[in-house]
Swiss-Prot record:
GO terms for biological process: signal transduction. PROSITE patterns: PPM_1 (PS01032), PPM_2 (PS51746). Its cofactor is Mg(2+); Mn(2+). The keyword Hydrolase applies. GO terms for cellular component: cytoplasm. The keyword DNA damage does not apply. SUPFAM superfamilies: PP2C-like. This is Protein phosphatase 2C homolog 4. Mn(2+) 1 binds at residues 83-84. Present with 149 molecules/cell in log phase SD medium. It comes from Saccharomyces cerevisiae (strain ATCC 204508 / S288c). One of its GO terms (molecular function) is metal ion binding. Its EC number is 3.1.3.16.
Length: 393
């Protein structure tokens, strides 16, 4: 668990994005209202970070769709949580924050800005070399896919690997690392969630429906354990090499010895032994390759998304967290107050016997409002729906 503070730091950073100015200036009702909250808690530092690209910061990409054989402009609304470990360098870098290290992991003091993971997501959409299986001349392409869903999922995997390659140039000798759970809504229709590590995303739907949009990556899970062992690693006490309680993460290059990245053929050497193996990044002991799940949004049923780090999921299971949020929605509580209560309740569960409740905590709630539906309209709809589901009216 590492060193802890004797008393928790319960000051919270709450960002409630109602986009009132946007609606007033454009007359267009915003989409995907959201609220993010974080709290340092008992940890010595805050190592969580997040990313929100919505409304004025929506990402637009020029994407070649081989299934219709033409270019399209796609809108990407992106929400992400990064849970750092070994410091906040990696998580802050992924979020597009400023970094302070040179290629050897030393402080350079200049705080150079960077675009973070979103840069590589956009790059991978605009520069992919994939086609459909119906293409009669597929030899010119890296790979062909049966479905657009499969192709887009591969694009997210490419983006994660490219980002990890960039991280190596800054943090090769650092012990920092980070999870990532990224929810990307494409053209306001299709939800893709790419996950690497044990942060998590879930989707709430009407009639108490809960859809898991990511799966935790733990070393003791059989598929992860096989990959770790095949690459010469071991798992003890639920940790890779007895150290890392994750089996997938950004950075953590001590567990990626000899990995060769495909973009610039950058080979990572074992820093202590200077051995090279040419291991694909997907086969490293701790791989950065995410799982990617897709969901077609049904605005008549789907209600909201929750993305959170494991500091939250140590306290709540999926059902408990959705129930907590809906309990407060039915009483008319706004999102910023719900997030505040969520964090306060979480820190109150700190238990030295179980070890839960001592981690940093970060959560994002994303409203899935239909086109033209204001935030107040959504609140009213949710309150009415929940009252009916609970037999209160």
């Amino acid at each position: 668990m590492g060193q802890l503070l004797s008393h928790p730091l319960t000051e919270k950073t709450i960002e409630y994005n109602e986009y009132k100015n946007n609606q007033a200036s454009t007359g267009i009702v915003p989409r995907f209202y959201n609220c993010v909250g974080s709290m340092q808690g008992y940890r010595l530092t805050q190592e969580d970070a997040h990313l929100i690209r919505n409304e004025n910061s929506v990402v637009y990409v020029r994407f070649f769709n081989p299934f219709i054989d033409k270019y399209e402009t796609l809108s990407l609304n992106v929400f992400a949580v990064f849970d750092g470990h070994g410091g906040d360098d990696c998580s802050k870098f992924l979020s597009g924050g400023r970094h302070h290290r040179d290629g050897n992991g030393s402080s350079n003091g200049n705080g150079e800005p960077n675009a973070g993971l979103i840069k590589w997501i956009a790059y991978s959409f605009e520069n992919h070399h994939y086609t459909s299986t119906t293409n009669n001349d597929s030899s010119k392409f890296k790979r062909s896919f049966n479905t657009l869903e499969g192709l887009v999922s591969q694009i997210f995997k490419d983006a994660f690997i490219l980002q990890d390659e960039e991280l190596y140039r800054h943090f090769a000798n650092s012990s920092c690392g980070s999870t990532a759970v990224v929810a990307c809504i494409i053209n306001e229709e299709s939800l893709y969630v790419a996950n690497c590590g044990d942060s998590r995303c879930i989707l709430s739907s009407k009639s108490n429906g809960i859809k898991t949009m990511s799966f935790d990556h733990k070393p003791q899970h059989i598929g992860e354990l096989i990959r770790i062992n095949d690459n010469g690693g071991t798992v003890s006490l639920g940790r890779v090499g007895g150290v890392l309680a994750l089996s997938r993460a950004f950075s953590d290059f001590q567990f990626k010895r000899g990995v060769t990245y495909p973009h610039r053929r950058t080979k990572l050497t074992n820093i202590t032994q200077n051995l090279t193996y040419g291991t694909p990044p997907q086969e490293a002991q701790v791989t950065v390759e995410p799982d990617v799940l897709m969901h077609k949004i049904d605005y008549s049923k789907d209600e909201f998304l929750v993305l959170a780090c494991d500091g939250i999921w140590d306290i709540y299971n999926n059902k408990q967290l959705i129930h907590f949020i809906k309990y407060h929605l039915v009483s008319g509580t706004k999102l910023d107050t719900i997030i505040t209560k969520l964090l306060d309740h979480g820190i109150a569960q700190a238990n030295s016997n179980t070890g839960v409740g001592f981690d940093n905590m970060t959560a994002i709630i994303v409203v899935l409002n239909r086109k033209g539906e204001t935030l107040q309209d959504w609140f009213n709809k949710m309150k009415t729906r929940l009252e009916r589901e609970r037999g209160l009216v």
